[in-house]
């Protein structure tokens, strides 16, 4: 990566009053013009990172760089960043125009330029014509758009968003995910988004940092994080997972549930204890005699797009299956899966060790040929 817009170098944070360490030796670099997400549960340290970038908190140790320059001692108003808070922090006694124009008025920008820039900012967030509207008469989604317009009107290098969608209902939250992502692409500004919602992170991000207990546990693209979780925490935090104890017999051969299965993982010691992950959507229901495993259906819930089926094998392991086919409680079904559906996690493997192992065993990445190519390939296989 060349010329990162934001960099953390060995940044730690300890709250002096309690002695609690909330960040532990954080290192990362953010590229300009990307959408980054800090994903983690409450207390993981994600908002602390955001507040240190903004200048609302000081790092206890380490360096924070903006465009290559150390900004640890730079005051908030001198940093080329803007924060959108969860509460939006709008002025209720001001109308939409005055809220969005507030920073420009402080800078004594000419009146005509303020009017033009406010109009353009509101147009970008689909609030054109709302200049005179009272903040108190806006919906939650509209207030959020005003907060974003106020953030982008100064044309900052970085926009920080601290769980801005959490107060919205599900439908509006989904709509705003699309709008935020498209806005970021149009502006080309670096967005740093904080959330505890893994679906938001997967849907919106170019790059995700998964956090736990003040540390970055894993970072990568949404596809990488979902398909190749580095440990038990990530596998359970990102989506649903079936996780079972296993033994890596040798490269590409794993044993679990008393049987041996082909896999696509390697680089581990012979007979090394591992954890095996299979996602619920990767399990296909078959006749019992045709399945690689047999399970008894315990219960199921209809989730709209699929049935969520809970079943147990003869060793007592719980299995979650996502299927468009309805099961019958108490029946025995078969489960089928491919070697590509099996993901192997080493015990206590670091992200650096994981990356080195993957790089050694993956000679080249498959090209992203797109959906149309995938459909054509499937049809070719069906016809051959």
UniProtKB/Swiss-Prot annotation:
Record domain ABC transporter: where: 6-238
Cell compartments where the protein resides: Cell membrane
Reactions this protein catalyses: ATP + H2O + polyamine-[polyamine-binding protein]Side 1 = ADP + phosphate + polyamineSide 2 + [polyamine-binding protein]Side 1
Matches recorded under SMART domains: AAA
Protein purpose: Part of the ABC transporter complex PotABCD involved in spermidine/putrescine import. Responsible for energy coupling to the transport system.
Leading EC class: translocase
EC number(s) per entry: 7.6.2.11
A GO CC term assigned to this protein in UniProt: ATP-binding cassette (ABC) transporter complex
The protein's name: Spermidine/putrescine import ATP-binding protein PotA
A Pfam family this chain is assigned to: ABC_tran
Record gene name: potA
Gene Ontology molecular function, alphabetical: ABC-type polyamine transporter activity; ATP binding; ATP hydrolysis activity
Chief place of localization: membrane
Annotated family: Belongs to the ABC transporter superfamily. Spermidine/putrescine importer (TC 3.A.1.11.1) family.
Keywords for the protein's UniProt record, in alphabetical order: ATP-binding, Cell membrane, Membrane, Nucleotide-binding, Translocase, Transport
Chain positions recorded as ATP binding sites: 40-47
Organism: Streptococcus thermophilus (strain CNRZ 1066)
């Amino acid at each position: 990566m060349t010329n990162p817009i934001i960099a953390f170098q060995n940044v730690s944070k300890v709250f002096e009053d309690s002695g609690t360490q909330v960040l532990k030796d954080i290192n990362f670099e953010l590229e300009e013009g990307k959408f980054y997400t800090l994903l983690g549960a409450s207390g993981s340290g994600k908002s602390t990172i955001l507040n240190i970038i903004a200048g609302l908190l000081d790092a206890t140790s380490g360096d924070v760089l903006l465009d290559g320059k150390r900004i640890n001692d730079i005051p908030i108003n001198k940093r080329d960043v803007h924060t959108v808070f969860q509460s939006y922090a709008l002025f209720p006694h001001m109308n939409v125009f005055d809220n969005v124009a507030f920073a420009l008025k402080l800078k004594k920008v000419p009146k005509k330029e303020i009017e033009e820039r406010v109009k353009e900012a509101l147009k970008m967030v689909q609030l054109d014509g709302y200049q005179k509207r009272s903040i108190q008469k806006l919906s939650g989604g509209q207030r959020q758009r005003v907060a974003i317009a106020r953030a982008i009107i100064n044309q900052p290098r970085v926009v920080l968003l601290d769980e801005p969608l959490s107060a919205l209902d599900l439908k509006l939250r989904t709509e705003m995910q699309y709008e935020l992502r498209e806005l970021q692409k149009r502006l080309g500004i670096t967005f740093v988004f904080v959330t505890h919602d893994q679906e938001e992170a997967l849907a919106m991000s170019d790059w995700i940092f998964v956090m736990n207990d003040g540390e970055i546990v894993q970072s990568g693209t949404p596809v990488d994080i979902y398909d190749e979780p580095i440990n038990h925490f990530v596998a359970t935090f990102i989506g649903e997972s079936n996780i079972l104890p296993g033994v890596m017999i040798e490269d590409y051969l794993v044993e679990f549930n008393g049987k041996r299965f082909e896999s696509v993982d390697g680089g581990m010691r012979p007979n090394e204890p591992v954890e095996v992950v299979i996602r619920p959507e990767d399990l296909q229901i078959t006749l019992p005699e045709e399945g690689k495993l047999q399970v008894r259906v315990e219960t199921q819930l209809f989730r709209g797009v699929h049935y969520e089926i809970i079943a147990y094998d003869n060793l007592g392991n719980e299995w979650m299956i996502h299927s468009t086919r309805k099961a019958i409680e108490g029946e025995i079904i078969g489960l089928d899966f491919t070697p590509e559906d099996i993901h192997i996690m080493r015990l206590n493997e670091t992200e650096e060790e994981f990356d080195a192992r993957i790089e050694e065993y993956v000679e080249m990445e498959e090209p992203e040929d797109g959906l149309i190519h995938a459909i054509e390939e499937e049809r070719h296989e069906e016809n051959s």
